[in-house]
Design a protein with these regions (language model features):
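Long, contiguous internal "core" modules enriched in hydrophobic/ aromatic residues
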Residues: 6-199
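General detector of N-terminal leader/presequence modules that precede the first folded domain
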Residues: 1-4
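Active/binding-pocket-proximal capping segment
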Residues: 122, 210-214
Length: 214
């Protein structure tokens, strides 16, 4: 979304005849990706969520930002009637496939991630065997329990992953192959991609396990 908003402003400037200097273009790109990276580190820096605490988390954010941003760029070029080169369309396909390749690697790493803490380590009784709490360490439900203790059945998570990949990657790539210069097709590709990314984002949060759920 940040990348798309930045691109929209860039195109708007060009559309009204404003010449954007090279340094301004580079500065815009740096600020956009710095924002994306900073956002990703909000999650990657949390040791309390093992699935997120990995270098591939910001890599996923940056790759999807690049892939979605270029796809949106192609759609805007087509809408404005500007030429779309084969190299741009091919780059969009490569970026999209690469982004999902990184995401598959993230899923594999996340599935193997284990919480750094346990009830035994939290109580300091790890050397005395298994520990079973008599009562919860809180008196009422809290935000973390609602937002970071969500349980998604494995079969549902697998289905949602397939939907995310299909809508967020496969369909947009197919549309790019079919009509890389059609405004209607490219707008559809952007819409489908964003829908798939919403599913991917929901899974990102729904599958996360905070140590509060021990």
């Amino acid at each position: 979304v940040v990348v798309m908003a930045g691109l929209a402003g860039w195109f708007a400037a060009g559309y009204i005849g404003t010449i954007v200097p090279l340094w301004a273009n580079l500065a815009l790109l740096v600020l956009i990706y710095a924002t994306v990276y900073a956002t990703s580190m909000i999650y990657a820096s949390l040791k309390t969520v093992a699935r997120w605490h990995h270098p591939l988390t910001p890599a996923c954010y940056l790759m999807f930002a690049a892939a979605g941003g270029l796809l949106a760029t192609l759609a805007l070029l087509a809408i404005l009637g500007l030429p779309i080169t084969a190299a741009l369309a091919q780059a969009a396909i490569v970026l999209m496939l690469s982004a999902w390749g990184v995401k598959f690697a993230w899923w594999r790493v996340a599935s193997a991630a284990r919480q750094a803490g346990s009830i035994e380590s939290a109580t300091g009784l790890a050397g005395m065997g298994a520990v079973r709490p008599l009562m919860p360490p809180h008196t009422e439900e809290n935000y973390l329990q609602h937002e970071m203790g969500f349980v998604v059945a494995r079969k549902h998570a697998t289905t949602l992953r397939r939907i995310a990949v299909l809508l967020g990657g496969v369909v947009p790539v197919m549309l790019l192959f079919v009509a890389p210069a059609s405004a209607v097709v490219l707008m559809l590709a952007v819409l489908v991609h964003v829908t798939g990314m919403f599913v991917e984002r929901w899974l990102f949060f729904a599958e996360a396990k905070h140590v509060v759920s021990l």
